[in-house]
Amino acid sequence: MSGLGQARRVVVKVGSALLVGPDGAPHADWLADFAADAARMRARGQQVLVVSSGAVALGRRRLGLARRALTLPEKQAAAAAGQSALMRAWEEAFEPHGAACAQVLLTRDDTEVRRRWLNARATVETLLGLGVVPVINENDTVVTEEIRYGDNDRLAARVAQLVGADVLVLLSDVDGLYTADPRKDPAARHIPRVPRLTPEVEAMAGGANAEGGVGTGGMATKIAAARIAAAGGCATVITLGSRTRPLAAVEGGERATVVEPATTPAAAYKAWIAGSLAPAGALVVDDGAAQAVRRGKSLLAAGVRRVEGRFDKGDAVLVRDEAGREIARGLVRYEAADAERICGLKSEAIEGVLGYTSGPLVHADDLALAAHAEA
């Protein structure tokens, strides 16, 4: 089982070879089939995000660039020219299903610099809440080699982490991982499930690289992406993208490789908060707030007695009781000066004091309990 039918949130990576034909024009029929596939999932309450290559390939045609290796300025120019054509193709595909698309362009800093990560996550969450299909791509127009993801397989894995996706689908030119390259070795065996990524699995992927003429990713990059996704609690499905309605095909039992996650998305996120971020300050809370946090509730301003340290919105902070015991760590939604101004206030009074509200001081989703603090 791929888990695709049960997933709440699915990220699908679509490569250039599926989207763009040899003549440099969009594959309109494939896009229409894929949109119908995604619309079927959306109709049963699932959220679908698309990580889409293709801007540079489409831009080549519009700018008349020869099919050769491009310089970085040429690639950036092609991306700028092709991105609008790419979005138009996606919009035309989803329009018959009443679904709006939205363009989201990212660089590596957007998923690795914490404040930008929070902003990117908030934007994508808002789009999903509005019923929009986010179409995400690397911002090739401005990106440099130092801040590139390198390929859209890795970008898709980072997006899966960003949004807490349950399943990442990597549409490939082969139907999964094999013990050797099946195009060269007739004895190669398909591997339907990878419970854990090992050096042996990665060695198999290194021998099964795709040799397409448009995109940049091969099987090794897909396994590298699966490792990123697994650490974030997301399963990865690698399957043949050229099938009619490839998502339905996977659900129907067509051949694919499923890389199982190491944990759940929520647990991975909480572990990241608890173990990877240095606290910039602390919020000292009363007994009622301490008990609420222990029960998995958000930390409201009304229960905060004191603010310690200097921190910005999105920084990690400690949550301590009045005896100095650490209860939790979390990502705060207000900078320190504003947090001090709203200490002890009820939620409905915050906007009148600050002129805005960002909800609770620390949302329950962004709180990781200390080991001894379980309710």
UniProtKB/Swiss-Prot annotation:
HAMAP family: ProB
Catalysed reactions listed for this entry: L-glutamate + ATP = L-glutamyl 5-phosphate + ADP
Compartments, as annotated in UniProt: Cytoplasm
Keyword Nucleus in record: no
PANTHER family documented for this protein: GLUTAMATE 5-KINASE, ISOPENTENYL PHOSPHATE KINASE
Residues annotated as domain PUA: 280-357
Pathway stated in the Swiss-Prot or TrEMBL entry: Amino-acid biosynthesis; L-proline biosynthesis; L-glutamate 5-semialdehyde from L-glutamate: step 1/2
Keyword annotations of the record: Amino-acid biosynthesis, ATP-binding, Cytoplasm, Kinase, Nucleotide-binding, Proline biosynthesis, Transferase
Taxonomy, superkingdom: Bacteria
Primary location class: cytoplasm
Key word Transferase present: yes
The protein's name: Glutamate 5-kinase
Enzyme Commission designation: 2.7.2.11
GO MF entries: ATP binding; glutamate 5-kinase activity; RNA binding
The family this protein is said to belong to: Belongs to the glutamate 5-kinase family.
Positions contributing to substrate binding: 53, 140, 152
